Design a protein with these regions (language model features):
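Conserved C-terminal beta-signal and adjacent last beta-strands/turns
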Residues: 6, 238, 284, 435-436, ...
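Gram-negative outer-membrane beta-barrel transporters
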Residues: 557-559, 577-679
């Protein structure tokens, strides 16, 4: 604890990351260019990043790790490097509850409500901007924002604002430890008659820090647009494919933290035991314990200026994704629904009904989905009131099915035997109205009041077998949500004061249903049906910006009704389980600062202190004798006010930037305090506090000076050293809802790489 406090104090003293001194004007300009972008109000809980800022240290890690210096954000990865499956939490809220849009089109998967960055590796290279609004933020499309909203824009923003009219081409290559390589080619092309195009292809490969977590990834992006004076039409196509080795099983505490010489790269996924002819046992690993998925997106956007006051935008979109993951595991036969159904034979005889023994099997779980719809917005600009009206209607179709391909010990099943299938449909529609009233609008003083009203309708239907327990689970639920928001901002000679209040509602995800609900076919009743959540978000903040420095603070109170919190347990695909808790809250203070010490030196940073609690929490814990025998002894319970799982009380980030004569060096330090793995506040089920420091070096060769030509190529050399102090840490994990008589817990952790170097 003392170490955590010391590190946090050091970061606060040294300076903290991404102060918004240069982004406030950018936010307003972007809103005029792209009418339908849900750009945040200029407030203290907002970060705006350009393409250059996003990709400064991009050596192949996925987007969550490129955002790791932003306030209250904790990035996690399965492979330990941030190349394969990566996620993040903001203010302790996991990625499934953070609204993400790309060109105002929902990016969260309709059922899981997750964004899988591994399907679109290196997407940051095609982004022109990224805005993070912590808290509820303004109305946007797709899933509700319960911790933050992230809006991303692709293409070349300069063309949309009419600033740039030059073709540019980019080729990037870098490689590093654990056989990590990234190749990228990018083109921004000026065509005749106001046509413009962007095209990119990226390839990323890595062995991963953990054994057998290799990633084989590619992604592409292309757009073609006509940029007229009053009208813009842009067609976008992008997507990618991934094959990654599984790393979501986790390891025990000693292995994750390298205690007693344990191999931190150990990965139990695909592990099984073979018996030789002499009766001796040995450990082997299934070579194709992998996740395989491909996703394609298409968007068509029209932006038209109807008059000097009215702007209109509309986007039609379509997304298709398909894939599977393959595992070789020892399971009970009932897991595959094989008892007494006539599908399974041993030799020439049928398996006896009721004989539920274990066997190794190779099986696949498949997903094939389609998502399509449209979004529209109209903006009226006047003095002193701007009004924006908009809405969206989206539809999702998803098919889930599992196939069993092999069983050990001469257990015979038909080829590609399908042991479950279920399908889902989801309708998501919303309409909203926003108004911004500039009460005072002088050169040095502005006072604005905004209001934002949204109605959202959701229908979720599913039919078929629940793969959790092989029972039928038909479901049809409707939700009607009203989400009001209001805020006030005051600016005067560098001072910015803001206050806001918002209500957000969110429907349960597919996992919330299939892991908690039991359907009684006889009565038609549902047992354990999860409730929709509601959030009341209060924010107040202050920022002062000077030519050489900026400092700000934001206070928030997020009051939840029926929040679905992570329990620490996860299912067989590595997704965390959740449960409703009636009363809970998150409160905190976010401090940002930045100073330009000299023309060649600046530092920026943030410090977030928070309190995240569940009131009147009650959870039963199964008691067992020890980890060798697992004999059930009884039950214990946890009652009272507890800390919400995966919610650190302190996060902080420091960023020093040195820039001299084409040479740039940045030193980034992140601090994260301890996190509980479940909601019992048990010190035996906890992630230790950690601190990591990364060093980025870059040199831009003086090609114009050497070649004596203005259009000489731009060549930059870079070196990225992650975790330079070789910290042994884990940034994610989980815990069973059980305890042993000696007080120990059955937990798992995701070990992260020590020092690793990449250059290009």
């Amino acid at each position: 604890m003392k170490k955590t406090i010391f590190l946090a104090a050091y970061v606060a003293a040294c300076g903290i990351a991404f102060a918004n001194t240069d982004t406030l004007t950018f936010v307003r300009e972007l809103d005029e260019v792209v009418v339908n972008a849900p750009v945040a109000q200029v407030t203290n809980n907002h970060v705006a990043l350009t393409n250059e800022q996003l990709n400064q240290s991009n050596t192949g890690q996925n987007l969550p790790f490129l955002l790791s210096a932003t306030p209250a954000l904790v990035a996690t990865s399965d492979d330990g490097l941030g190349v394969g499956y990566t996620y993040f939490r903001i203010r302790g809220t996991d990625h499934t509850r953070i609204n993400m849009t790309l060109n105002n089109v929902p990016l969260n998967d309709s059922e899981s409500q997750t964004v899988f960055w591994v399907n679109m590796t290196d997407m940051a290279s095609s982004m022109s901007s990224l805005n993070i609004q912590r808290g509820v933020g303004t109305s946007t499309n797709g899933s509700a924002s319960f911790g933050a909203s992230i809006n991303m824009q692709t293409g070349n923003q300069c063309w949309e604002s009419g600033v740039e009219d030059k073709s540019r081409y980019e080729l990037s290559f870098n490689g590093g430890m654990y056989n990590t390589f990234r190749e990228m080619v990018n083109a921004h092309i000026v065509l005749p008659n106001q046509w413009r195009a962007n095209a990119r292809f990226s390839k990323v490969n890595s062995d991963g820090f953990l054994y057998r977590t290799a990633s084989d990834l590619y992604s592409y992006y292309g757009d073609l647009g006509w940029y007229g004076i009053k009208t813009k039409v842009i067609a976008r196509f992008f997507g990618g494919s991934e094959k990654t080795g599984m790393g979501w099983d986790g390891v025990d505490y000693n292995t994750a933290y390298g205690i007693d010489g344990a191999d931190r790269r150990y990965n139990p996924a695909g592990e099984y035991t073979t018996t030789a002819a002499d009766g001796s046992d040995s450990t082997a690993y299934y070579p194709n314990q992998t996740d395989n998925y491909a996703q394609q997106h298409a968007q068509l956007t029209l932006i038209h200026r109807l008059s000097t006051r009215w702007n209109l935008s509309a986007t039609a979109h379509y997304t298709h994704g398909a894939g599977y993951y393959e595992q070789y595991k020892r399971k009970k036969l009932s897991y595959w629904g094989l008892l007494g159904n006539g599908q399974l034979a041993i030799g020439n005889g049928q398996l006896a009904i009721g004989e539920d023994r274990k066997a190794y099997g190779m099986y696949r779980k498949h997903l094939d989905n389609h998502f399509f719809g449209g979004v529209v917005a109209a903006k009226y600009i006047s003095e002193p009131v701007d009004v924006q009206l908009g809405g969206a209607a989206n539809y999702y179709i998803g098919d889930h099915f599992g196939t069993l391909n092999y069983l050990e010990d001469s257990l015979i099943v038909p080829i590609n035997y399908e042991y479950y299938r279920n399908d889902a449909k989801k309708t998501d529609a919303n309409i909203y109205a926003k108004a911004n009233w500039r009460i005072i609008n002088r050169a040095q003083e502005q006072l604005s009041l905004y209001a934002d009203l949204q109605y959202r309708y959701v229908r979720y239907e599913r039919n078929g077998m629940n793969d959790e327990d092989m029972t039928d689970l038909p479901l049809k639920v409707d939700f009607h949500f009203f989400n009001p928001k209001a805020g006030l901002t005051y600016q005067n000679r560098g001072h910015l004061l803001s206050a806001s209040f918002a209500i957000a509602n969110r429907e349960p995800s597919r996992n919330n249903y299939k892991e908690n609900v039991v359907y009684d076919a006889a009565t038609g009743e549902y047992i354990g049906l999860p409730h929709a959540e509601r959030l009341y978000d209060y924010e107040v903040g202050y920022t002062y910006s000077h030519q050489r420095f900026a400092v700000g603070a934001n206070l928030y109170w997020m009051d939840y009704d029926n929040q679905l919190v992570l329990t620490g347990e996860y299912n067989d695909v590595g997704a965390y389980k959740t449960k409703n808790v009636k009363d809970s809250y998150r409160m905190g203070a976010e401090v940002t600062a930045g100073v330009k010490i000299a023309d060649w030196l600046r530092w920026d940073g943030n410090l977030v202190a928070s309190r995240n609690k569940i009131l009147n929490y009650h959870q039963y814990i199964d008691l067992y004798d020890d980890q060798d025998n697992w004999n059930w002894v009884g039950q214990d319970s946890v009652v009272g006010t507890t800390t919400i799982a995966f919610s650190p009380t302190i996060t902080a980030s420091s960023l020093f930037t040195f820039d001299v004569a084409g040479f740039t060096a940045t030193v980034q330090t992140n601090v994260v305090s301890k996190q509980y793995l479940d909601n019992t506040e048990d010190e035996n089920a906890m992630l230790r506090a950690y601190s990591t420091t990364n060093l980025h070096l870059q040199y831009q060769l003086p090609m114009q000076q050497w070649c004596k030509m203005d259009n000489a190529p731009d060549i930059r050399l870079l070196c990225q050293i992650n975790n330079i102090f070789n910290a042994k840490y884990a940034n994610n994990g989980g815990a069973e809802a059980s305890r042993f008589m000696d007080g120990s817990r059955c937990c798992w952790y995701y070990a992260q790489a020590g020092i690793n170097v990449h250059a290009g």
